């Protein structure tokens, strides 16, 4: 055999070997990927209540140690009521957009939600009778911007360990953010342009740390992201308080990037899911830049537009479903996609 032929054969063997090694590596990656899929034995369909259906969608173990659940709720209605801050006072508040329970008004109470049957704009219908509301958002010319396909998250969050999260108590209500004149920080009220590149450390790419607490100047064709985060540490006693805030607290922060290394303060020792409202708006020639938009609650012209971002929440979940969300998705560290309940079922879709 000539030296040239021998070299060609060696080269061919090396190529084959590299192909085999690449195939094995790819197979290993696939095997590891599939190993992250949660093995589920779904319940019998006859056992499912209305609003809950079987689903063969895969659920994966979260890659960052958090446990997550998400759900969609459509806009329901608009009014100037606020049953938490102005109970039984029709029209006493600034304009709000409501989601979930379709009859939320100044007279809505926890009993109202718990006795409701089929009035909800959320996935699962009557299984999620929670009342969600936020101030209306307007362009510079006064056109209201619709909250399209918003996502409502129930997560362990990055600060607390997933396995210590408790089911929120029935009857719990709370407010995130401030509608008053004092400026707020980005713990609760978060805005950012989707085109921004976060320059600071973060827990993961889904939690950039370049948010601002006011409406930013996003260019045309960009996307404005808005996120309102509720406190997740409960005092363990009171379902409400005089200001709808004092019975709740934000956790003591984890050390970046170590997820779950924070804790609840001693005054508010009970950890519940981190609830957040998540919205996105396209920036167009018609809407103009978000820096020119304003909230219905923006009353102080000395502060940047959007500084009054806040949200209200009243727990109207079916207790069994909320327990499934916490036990199946959050405590386990699973990443349950929109509507998935972590047991081979999901909430009935609305889109």
Predicted regions, residues:
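N-terminal Sec-pathway targeting helices
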Residues: 3-17
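Short, aromatic- and cysteine-enriched interfacial helices/patches
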Residues: 1-3, 29-33
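Hydrophobic alpha-helical membrane-insertion segments, chiefly the h-region
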Residues: 18-30
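Primary mode marks residue(s) on the alpha4-beta5-alpha5 output face of response regulator receiver
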Residues: 33-93, 97-228, 235-351
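A generic signature of intrinsically disordered, low-complexity regions enriched in glycine/proline
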Residues: 11-13, 26, 98
